[in-house]
Structure formats: structure tokens, C-alpha cells
């Protein structure tokens, strides 16, 4: 049932994207239908998981040479619903070797005993809960990429219902482009790296040229696989993260990947973002970064601090040293 409802949802989203492209807008009836579908999906899945909890181990028993690590983070306002997201990650058609939830010590001073019962039950089925410094959304990659440096790390958000084939599709892309960062959804960076993120666009259905490229920005939350050595050491500079790009891990990872010469690949056929858990969008970083324009500010910070990139992605340090000195004073 879960997979069937997702197929219907994807069909509606693709139909809407075709219509929006031809009509330049979404009809009201379509938006109402889509909202109803998302509402029905939320009711169906939450009731299903409540009434029929899964008691089986939800990580693989197969010994892999290179493990699959799913990493995500959350904060107090979503600690009561993140178990839904984790459940969808546990019920993937391809199982992970480990699912790690990173929590900030400062936000959960009571430790494991103060966490919801659902999360503690998931620990018995393979969930790992780790406590760390508070780096906001950057927690989901910062520690995992360093601790599991030889494994494949898959990033996830804390407010989504993931389709059962998410890990499967990421691994399929990884086999085609083993050194690339592979993501389910992305944004096209155009016309140049100097343009504001608010001007970038979403891919069209079946758009070509979005694999093994430096022309896209990964939406890490939709599901993103990062192979070993994809990011440079400077990607783990806490002070730079907090000063330059505190709210946008997507921008930080994509910028650092391009800076490191790592290409990014997304699906050949456009797939919409996963369905959100109702009640979580209010505090979403989407509104801070997108609606409030913080993406533009943070991208400008990165370009000025590290040096701009030319149209082909090549790095230039022109004007960067002076800006580094001024920014460093505030770090």
C-alpha cells in the first residue's frame, strides 16, 4: 500500500510539472488534489505505523566490504515525529548497515532516558543514537563523514516519509558514478556560479546533462549518497560553517564538492521531493533559506570567502584573500 500510494503521488506531481511547464502555472484543482493526496498519505502511514509496529531488526545482516550508513539529525521540536522518518528508512528495500541519529548535547541534556519511547524501541531494532555539538543541520553529515570515512554515507532529513526504493536508487547511481555525490533531487546552478540561488531552477522532467556535473546543487534531504573523499578537509571547519553558512548544509556540501573537484549526479528521470510529515513545515529551513533569502546571503559568503568560481567550475582566488581577513575577524 505504501509503495502504491507513493506511485500515485509521483504520477500526480509529474503530471503537474508537465502542466506547469506548458501553462506556466499550476491549476487550483491540481493543487487541491495534491494537498489531499499528501494529507491522505500522512493519515495512512501514521495510523499504519501506530497500529502495526514492526518488531524486526531493520539493518542488514549481510557483511559488506563497504558499509551503507544512513545519517540524520533532529532537534527538540521534531523529536516526537522523527521516528516516522526513521521507520521509513528502516523499511527500505535495500537495508542499511547502520542508521545514526545525531542529537545535540545542549538540546537534550537528559540524554537517552528523556527521548520518546518510539525512538528507544527503534534502538532495539538497529537505530544508533549519538550525542554531539550543535551544528544545526550540518550535524547530519559532519560527524558521520569523518567517523565512517571509508563507507558510503547517505544523508536524510528528519521530516520526510522516504520511498522504499530511496537507498536502492542511490546505490544504482553510485555504481554508475562511484566518485560522485549522488542525490535524488537537485537544483540547476545557472547561468553561472555567481548567480544567486534564488535564481537557480529545478530540473525539467527527463532533462539531460545532470549526471556527473558541477552544474547542480544537491538537495541533501531528499536522500544523498556521499562516497569517501568527496569533500575536502576544509569542509569540516566548524568556525567557517557557523560563520559563513550556518543554515544551509545543502549549499555547503555542494560548494565544497565543486571546490574539491567532485561531481554531483541526480536521477535521469525527475522525481519530486518526498512527502513531508504534517506539522513539521512550520520550522523548516526552507523558509529561512528560501523565503527569507538566506540562501543568497550564505552563497555570497562562500564565494567571497573562498574565491569565486568560473563558468566551468574552476576556482579563482581573486579578491578572496581580502574578504577572508575581514570575515576571519568575526570568526
Question: Whereabouts are the PLM-identified features?
Answer:
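C-terminal catalytic/acceptor-binding lobe
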Residues: 2-48, 233, 239-331
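Active-site beta-to-alpha loop of glycosyltransferases that engages the nucleotide-sugar donor
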Residues: 72-84, 94
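Short internal beta-strands
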Residues: 100-104, 183
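Active-site-proximal specificity loops/subdomain of glycosyltransferases
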Residues: 104-151
